[in-house]
């Protein structure tokens, strides 16, 4: 006899928590799952990106995920969240109330990824993972003043490129 317990689809969909990886190659193996779960949450539109990242982290590593492991997860997953958020936006759309188009942001972030990856990581953590400047500084083991300075520089640089 088949019971509801035997046909429960959540057992198939949900995967048990995994141990946060140490090796970069192990993180890369998790990348498709992280991207899929972030995309599902983004298309549902129910959560800000930072909250979605934290939810995926808890799904992956369980409720007992340490702050250290969550930080490592955010450093790895924030660029994925950025690409998904920008990918879902219309290239002609503007960012907030500004004159900045999504396409301009895509080009600028691509440049930043190549020429100042640390600043790009700061932007990912601050704007896409929702961390404060202090939290971003702690995650990257930098002083808050350095993070604030670099975020201000990035914003000013973007404004000069778009004038």
Where are these regions (language model features)?
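Intrinsic, short, N-terminal disordered tails of RNA polymerase sigma-factor systems
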Residues: 1-163
């Amino acid at each position: 006899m088949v019971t509801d317990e035997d046909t429960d689809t959540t057992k198939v969909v949900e995967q048990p928590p995994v141990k946060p990886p140490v090796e970069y190659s192990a993180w890369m193996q998790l990348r498709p799952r992280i991207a899929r779960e972030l995309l599902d949450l983004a298309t549902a539109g129910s959560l800000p990106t930072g909250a979605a990242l934290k939810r995926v982290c808890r799904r992956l590593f369980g409720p007992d995920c340490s702050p250290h492991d969550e930080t490592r997860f955010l450093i790895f997953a924030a660029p994925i969240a950025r690409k998904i958020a920008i990918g879902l936006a219309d290239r002609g759309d503007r960012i907030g109330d500004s004159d900045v188009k999504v396409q301009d942001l895509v080009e600028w972030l691509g440049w930043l990824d190549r020429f100042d990856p640390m600043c790009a990581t700061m932007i990912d953590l601050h704007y896409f993972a929702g961390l404060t400047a202090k939290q971003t500084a702690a995650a990257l083991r930098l002083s808050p003043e350095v993070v604030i300075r670099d975020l201000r520089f990035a914003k000013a640089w973007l404004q000069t490129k778009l004038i």
